[in-house]
Protein backbone atom coordinates (compact mmCIF):
# COMPACT_ATOMS: atom_id res chain seq x y z
CA UNK A 1 0.00 0.00 0.00
CA UNK A 2 1.28 3.48 -0.87
CA UNK A 3 1.48 6.06 1.90
CA UNK A 4 0.39 9.31 0.26
CA UNK A 5 1.18 11.43 3.32
CA UNK A 6 4.90 10.80 3.09
CA UNK A 7 4.92 11.55 -0.64
CA UNK A 8 3.05 14.86 -0.65
CA UNK A 9 3.14 16.03 -4.22
CA UNK A 10 1.01 19.16 -4.34
CA UNK A 11 1.74 22.37 -2.45
CA UNK A 12 -1.57 21.94 -0.60
CA UNK A 13 -0.65 18.42 0.55
CA UNK A 14 2.72 19.72 1.77
CA UNK A 15 0.99 22.53 3.69
CA UNK A 16 -1.52 20.11 5.24
CA UNK A 17 1.28 17.78 6.33
CA UNK A 18 3.24 20.70 7.78
CA UNK A 19 0.40 21.52 10.19
CA UNK A 20 -0.16 17.94 11.28
CA UNK A 21 -2.12 16.41 8.43
CA UNK A 22 -5.48 18.12 8.95
CA UNK A 23 -7.31 20.24 6.38
CA UNK A 24 -9.38 21.73 9.20
CA UNK A 25 -6.30 22.83 11.16
CA UNK A 26 -4.76 24.39 8.05
CA UNK A 27 -8.00 26.23 7.33
CA UNK A 28 -8.17 27.61 10.88
CA UNK A 29 -4.54 28.75 10.84
CA UNK A 30 -4.82 30.41 7.43
CA UNK A 31 -8.18 32.00 8.24
CA UNK A 32 -10.35 30.28 5.64
CA UNK A 33 -13.10 27.68 5.82
CA UNK A 34 -12.43 23.96 5.56
CA UNK A 35 -14.58 24.09 2.42
CA UNK A 36 -12.09 26.54 0.86
CA UNK A 37 -9.25 24.08 1.52
CA UNK A 38 -11.33 21.27 0.03
CA UNK A 39 -11.97 23.40 -3.07
CA UNK A 40 -8.22 23.96 -3.49
CA UNK A 41 -7.71 20.21 -3.25
CA UNK A 42 -10.33 19.53 -5.91
CA UNK A 43 -8.73 22.12 -8.20
CA UNK A 44 -5.32 20.48 -8.20
CA UNK A 45 -3.73 21.53 -4.92
CA UNK A 46 -2.19 24.86 -5.88
CA UNK A 47 -2.26 27.58 -3.23
CA UNK A 48 -3.61 31.10 -3.81
CA UNK A 49 -0.88 33.70 -4.28
CA UNK A 50 -2.98 36.24 -2.37
CA UNK A 51 -2.31 34.33 0.86
CA UNK A 52 1.33 33.48 0.14
CA UNK A 53 2.76 35.03 3.32
CA UNK A 54 0.09 33.47 5.51
CA UNK A 55 0.74 29.97 4.14
CA UNK A 56 4.49 30.46 4.64
CA UNK A 57 3.92 31.68 8.20
CA UNK A 58 1.58 28.92 9.36
CA UNK A 59 3.41 26.02 7.69
CA UNK A 60 7.00 27.12 8.19
CA UNK A 61 7.66 26.05 4.60
CA UNK A 62 9.49 28.36 2.18
CA UNK A 63 7.67 29.88 -0.77
CA UNK A 64 9.82 27.81 -3.13
CA UNK A 65 8.09 24.69 -1.76
CA UNK A 66 4.60 26.17 -1.59
CA UNK A 67 4.72 28.00 -4.93
CA UNK A 68 7.07 26.00 -7.19
CA UNK A 69 5.50 27.43 -10.34
CA UNK A 70 6.51 30.94 -9.32
CA UNK A 71 9.75 30.45 -7.40
CA UNK A 72 12.48 28.08 -8.51
CA UNK A 73 13.64 25.78 -5.71
UniProtKB/Swiss-Prot annotation:
Residues 12-66 form the HTH cro/C1-type domain. Signal peptide: none annotated. Keywords: DNA-binding, Early protein, Repressor, Transcription, Transcription regulation. InterPro entries: Cro/C1-type_HTH (IPR001387), Lambda_DNA-bd_dom_sf (IPR010982). CDD domains: HTH_XRE. The keyword Nucleus does not apply. GO terms for molecular function: DNA binding. Residues 23-42 bind DNA. It holds the Pfam family HTH_3. This is Gene 30 protein.
Amino acid sequence: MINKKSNASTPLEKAINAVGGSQKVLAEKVGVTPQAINMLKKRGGSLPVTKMRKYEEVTGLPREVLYPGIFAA
